[in-house]
């Protein structure tokens, strides 16, 4: 398992379900996909569900 999975990231913008945007993890911006069926708002804390390449798959906490 990737050591980043389970960590907390912060959404840098509003993300509708399955949308791609940015999230900050450990002070670094990452590409992020909302893996949830609900929207994520800018500034919302999210859990990293999985990592594919340089893309975080996040869900709201």
What are the functions of these language-model segments?
Residues 2-61:
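Terminal membrane-proximal soluble interaction domains of membrane-associated proteins
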